[in-house]
């Protein structure tokens, strides 16, 4: 049975993936396509609704993104948001002007709640605006259904053609009625049922992988992270022992992480699981290297060599599992999967290793990947594992790497994670970790002078890692973490907490 589909047309706005996630929260499947995507291709996908996103351009600029008027003849409801609202109005004969006063942030708006778009929503609401242009009058046949102090045409509708536009951003949390408005569009205007669920996704994916793989062999480069673990589990459910997972333990993992991954996938789920202990090999290559980009390159290249050696031992392999998720697809503009000779997650596989790619998660956002993991019975602790960079602790130990520095960082990080979990903050904070900034400072311990390392703690709140704010961890939790690390981790006498947002800082220190 063909599933319901909403197309999100991307005009370059910062919230575009968030729009798609909001649609999927309503159990409606949607895909993001660039504004250059042809109307014929959109028609072929047979969407039940179309959403135009925001964007950074002005619609009256010569080089501003445009779209063919033919899209309105497909005959399905269309909703324009911010730039999308302005684009609908200018394309169909309305007028957009540059505003004297910019509307940015929380804005009061008056809505016509007799419109189906605003059904069940109060007349006077607050919303999130972010624009310097405004619609000064709507196209012929359109009715104004919303206005604000600086936007006389903050929302429009053409009931006959089922075309709607809003100047504000319903997808963000700062628009309290936004989820209800999107729900109205999906279920009352597009007449969708909401047939997208993780259980149906898993069933469909297992069936399609079985058909594609047949009796051939499959390998997966497993990192122990959420994406590769869930991807491997789906393929294992489909083809069983035809899948072999290769777990390269480079000695740069968090405390006990390698053992936990092996216990789950080899012992609990009975997978073909090869763990390669390559710690000495990696540390030798990283000796005296302090530049973070050089570290990344060395680790990536060595990973390829180890993976190649192990893969060749398995004989002829037809397929490679990759944990690509939907944001990767959107941000890189990837098309349909094809036979590849590179694997972007591990820096590129050797040219003589040809695999057909299996990307079971390429349609999913991160929260959906976690939901699939739970559906498949992967332990909750692994499904909610913290994001962890491919180079591991190599980029959380600033400067050159030694076994001593790695152990200090590993032990400090374990204490931090343990106390965050005890405080029931582990699923509300997006990412939290300890790093070693390669700073020594003077201290006093037991009436003696010390000259030891400093540990920096980093914890951030985010939804997508594109932007983040530092987490306001209760002082008593930070106090306990600090005292435990100083007392339990040899070689540390000072703890600092990073209170920088992204931007200007990145989440990781290197």
UniProtKB/Swiss-Prot annotation:
Residue ranges occupied by any GMPS ATP-PPase domain in the UniProt entry: 196-385
For this protein, what is the EC number? 6.3.5.2
* Active site positions, chain numbering: 82, 169, 171
Q: Give me the reactions it catalyses.
A: XMP + L-glutamine + ATP + H2O = GMP + L-glutamate + AMP + diphosphate + 2 H(+)
Q: Where does ATP bind?
A: 223-229
Annotated Gene Ontology cellular components are:
cytosol
InterPro entries given in the database record: Class_I_gatase-like, GATASE, GMP_synth_C, GMP_synth_GATase, GMP_synthase, GMPS_ATP_PPase_dom, Rossmann-like_a/b/a_fold
Q: In which pathway does it act?
A: Purine metabolism; GMP biosynthesis; GMP from XMP (L-Gln route): step 1/1
Keyword check for Ligase, yes or no: yes
What this chain does, per the entry, is described as:
Catalyzes the synthesis of GMP from XMP.
Q: Partners and quaternary state?
A: Homodimer.
* Name of the protein described by the UniProt record: GMP synthase [glutamine-hydrolyzing]
Which organism is the protein's source? Clostridium kluyveri (strain ATCC 8527 / DSM 555 / NBRC 12016 / NCIMB 10680 / K1)
Its gene is: guaA
């Amino acid at each position: 049975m063909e599933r319901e589909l909403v197309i999100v047309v991307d005009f370059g706005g910062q919230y575009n993936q968030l729009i798609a996630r909001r649609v999927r929260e309503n159990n409606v499947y949607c895909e993001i396509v660039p504004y250059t995507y042809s109307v014929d291709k959109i028609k072929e996908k047979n969407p039940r609704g179309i959403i135009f996103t925001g964007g950074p351009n002005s619609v009256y600029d010569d080089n501003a993104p445009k779209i063919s008027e033919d899209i309105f003849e497909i005959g399905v409801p269309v909703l324009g948001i911010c730039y999308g609202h302005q684009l609908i109005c200018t394309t169909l004969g309305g007028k957009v002007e540059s505003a004297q006063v910019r509307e940015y942030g929380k804005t009061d708006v008056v809505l016509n709640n007799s419109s189906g778009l605003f059904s069940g929503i109060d007349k006077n609401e607050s919303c999130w605006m972010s624009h310097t242009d405004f619609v000064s009058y709507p196209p012929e046949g359109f009715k104004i259904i919303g206005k604000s102090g600086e936007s006389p045409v903050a929302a429009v509708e053409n009931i006959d053609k089922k075309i709607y536009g809003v100047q504000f951003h319903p997808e963000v949390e700062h628009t309290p009625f936004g989820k209800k408005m999107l729900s109205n569009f999906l279920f009352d205007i597009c007449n969708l049922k909401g047939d997208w669920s993780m259980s149906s996704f898993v069933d469909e994916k297992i069936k399609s992988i079985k058909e594609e793989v047949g009796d051939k062999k499959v390998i997966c480069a497993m990192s122990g992270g959420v994406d590769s673990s869930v991807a491997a589990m789906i393929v294992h459910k489909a083809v069983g022992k035809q899948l072999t997972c290769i777990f390269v333990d480079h000695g740069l993992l968090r405390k006990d992480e390698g053992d936990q991954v092996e216990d789950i996938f080899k012992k609990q789920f009975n997978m073909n699981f090869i763990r390669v202990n390559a710690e000495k090999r990696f540390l030798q290559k990283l000796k005296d290297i302090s530049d973070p980009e050089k570290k990344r390159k060395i680790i990536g290249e060595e990973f390829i060599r180890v993976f190649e050696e192990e893969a060749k031992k398995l004989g002829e392999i037809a397929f490679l599992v990759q944990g690509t998720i939907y944001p990767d697809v959107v941000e890189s503009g990837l098309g349909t999967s094809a036979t590849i000779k590179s694997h972007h997650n591990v820096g590129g596989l050797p040219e003589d290793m040809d695999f057909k790619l299996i990307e079971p998660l390429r349609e999913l956002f991160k929260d959906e990947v976690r939901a699939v993991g739970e559906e498949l019975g992967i332990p909750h602790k692994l499904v909610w594992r913290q994001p962890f960079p491919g180079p591991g602790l190599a980029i959380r130990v600033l400067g050159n790497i030694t076994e001593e520095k790695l152990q200090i960082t590993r032990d400090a990080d374990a204490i931090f994670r343990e106390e965050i979990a005890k405080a029931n903050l582990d699923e509300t904070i997006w990412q939290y970790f300890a790093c070693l900034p390669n700073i020594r400072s003077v201290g006093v311990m037991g009436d003696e002078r010390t000259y030891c390392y400093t540990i920096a703690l980093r914890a951030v709140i985010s939804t997508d890692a594109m932007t983040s704010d530092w987490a306001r961890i209760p002082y008593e939790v930070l106090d306990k973490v600090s005292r435990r690390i100083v007392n339990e981790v040899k070689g540390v006498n000072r703890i600092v907490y990073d209170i920088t947002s992204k931007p200007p800082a990145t989440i990781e220190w290197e």
